[in-house]
């Protein structure tokens, strides 16, 4: 049995408002009351399941996506499907439909991914749902400021609450974690309050974030006081003055967790 997945991310902040330059066919033209989409760069985190005849497979993803003029998309995605991981850059298209939802179509090596996004009154994407048959996946969106990131952008206090799944005895078991972290130039010391399969524990950990060159993506490696290693693909969410926090997706096959860790 696959347990339902949820994730919480605070509401997105303001971005730079520009107009999409695409000209959809008259039958697809959005009403004049629709908000003008906000172009820019976004961090996206989603969780859900891919349904199958025999069983459901949990899935989660983290994306960095750019909304460009002319309804064009460019991005990078890291995705977990069960115990496997895949990642790729991609391109796509976006258009406003008659219901004032943005329809996105991403071209990926493993297929075309379609989703619909709800915008707030200022045209900022907040939530989306996957529209591919056989998927039950929702995502939340955060704006990112232009430019690359530094590990030192996270210096200070970072807090999080997240849920995930662990592979045990041939099936997925739920887990939940609350964390408090202190960051200094890419090094982290933290304390985690966790429950795995209903068994609670409190454990300290340390780790190191190594960012890719000229990027906001990086690899985060952590080890707790009991010697257990944890590995993540991380995306620092760049703000206009330092980092707003970071998203991560766990790489360890037996643990599937995506989290939004907020810089205080």
Give the predicted meaning of each segment.
Residues 27-264:
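Mature soluble binding/inhibitory domains
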Residues 10-21:
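Bacterial N-terminal signal peptides
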Residues 19-29:
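Signal peptide processing junction and immediate N-terminal pro/mature segment
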Residues 1-12:
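Bacterial N-terminal signal peptides that target proteins for export
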């Amino acid at each position: 049995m696959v347990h339902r997945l949820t994730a919480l991310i605070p509401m997105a902040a303001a971005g730079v408002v520009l107009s999409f330059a695409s000209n959809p066919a008259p039958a697809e033209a959005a009403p004049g009351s629709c908000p003008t989409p906000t172009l820019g760069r976004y961090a996206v985190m989603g969780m859900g399941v891919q349904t199958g005849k025999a069983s459901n497979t949990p899935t989660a993803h983290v994306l960095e996506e750019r909304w460009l003029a002319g309804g064009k998309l460019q991005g990078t995605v890291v995705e977990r499907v069960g115990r496997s991981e895949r990642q790729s850059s991609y391109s796509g298209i976006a258009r406003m439909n008659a219901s004032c939802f943005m329809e996105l179509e991403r071209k990926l090596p493993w297929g075309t991914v379609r989703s619909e996004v709800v915008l707030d009154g200022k045209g900022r994407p907040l939530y989306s749902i996957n529209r591919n048959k056989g998927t039950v996946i929702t995502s939340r969106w955060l704006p990112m400021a232009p430019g690359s990131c530094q590990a030192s952008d996270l210096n200070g206090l970072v807090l999080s609450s997240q849920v995930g799944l662990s592979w045990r005895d041939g099936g997925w078991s739920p887990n939940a974690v609350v964390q408090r972290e202190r960051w200094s130039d890419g090094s982290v010391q933290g304390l985690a309050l966790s429950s795995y399969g209903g068994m609670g524990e409190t454990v300290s950990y340390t780790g190191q974030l190594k960012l890719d060159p000229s990027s906001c993506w990086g690899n985060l490696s952590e080890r707790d006081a009991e010697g257990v290693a944890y590995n993540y693909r991380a995306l620092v969410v760049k703000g206009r003055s330092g980092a707003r926090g970071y998203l991560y997706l766990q790489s360890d096959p037996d643990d599937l967790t995506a989290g939004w860790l907020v810089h205080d």
